[in-house]
């Protein structure tokens, strides 16, 4: 799916990547449903593909789906990528209710990764979606990594309510502010997802979501 809307936030991170000024932690903050998690994952894929240097990459965030980096991330097997999200309450029923929080155990599981060097390039990327879901102990454990970031590691932290985060976490991150999508952006997303929908149907869906 194409990245639509919030181009200024996209460009801020892209510029940091081009200029070699990539801070170790980025807080991707804004209302729910505006593409923050999708952008974090697209950015992680692009960062790792660029660092690996094995693919011919066009400008923008796109990475060829046949690239090794894309295949490994899709399979959950990339050694330099981790994603922390709320897990199912019952591991045997992954399609049912999710746990209330991202646990401290999930955060601590990163330590084994940080004890080794990245495998495919000098870079690794951690996505947390959403950091608002961290248990208090998990937030404190993460803070230690943000204060003393492992070499080559980039944290992309999605937040729907950054004001509720520990001030010490916010202070160690560069902010990428995402805004609510306007009707034109919503229409573009709906056309991407529903290519057979008419203009009238798209307009009705936008109206229903107001």
Task: Give short role names for the model-derived ranges.
Residues 4-7, 88-210:
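Non-catalytic interfacial helical region
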Residues 1-137:
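Clamp-loader machinery-focused feature within the broader ASCE/P-loop NTPase space
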């Amino acid at each position: 799916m194409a990245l639509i809307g919030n181009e200024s936030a996209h460009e801020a991170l892209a510029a940091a990547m081009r200029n070699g000024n990539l801070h170790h932690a980025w807080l991707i903050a804004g209302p729910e449903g505006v593409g923050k998690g999708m952008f974090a994952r697209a950015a992680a894929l692009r960062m790792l593909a660029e660092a690996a240097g094995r693919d011919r990459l066009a400008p923008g965030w796109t990475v060829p789906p046949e690239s090794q980096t894309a295949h490994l991330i899709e399979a959950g097997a990339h050694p330099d990528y981790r994603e922390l999200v709320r897990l199912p309450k019952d591991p045997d029923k992954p399609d049912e209710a999710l746990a209330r929080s991202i646990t401290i155990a999930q955060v601590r599981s990163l330590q084994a990764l940080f004890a080794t060097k990245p495998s495919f390039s000098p870079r690794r990327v951690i996505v947390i979606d959403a950091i608002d879901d961290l248990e208090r102990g998990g937030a404190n454990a993460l803070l230690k990594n943000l204060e003393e970031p492992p070499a080559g590691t980039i944290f992309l932290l999605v937040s729907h309510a950054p004001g509720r985060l520990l001030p010490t976490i916010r202070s160690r991150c560069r902010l990428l502010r995402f805004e609510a999508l306007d009707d034109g952006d919503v229409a573009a997303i709906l056309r991407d997802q529903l290519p057979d929908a008419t203009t009238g149907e798209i307009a009705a869906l936008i109206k229903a979501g107001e």
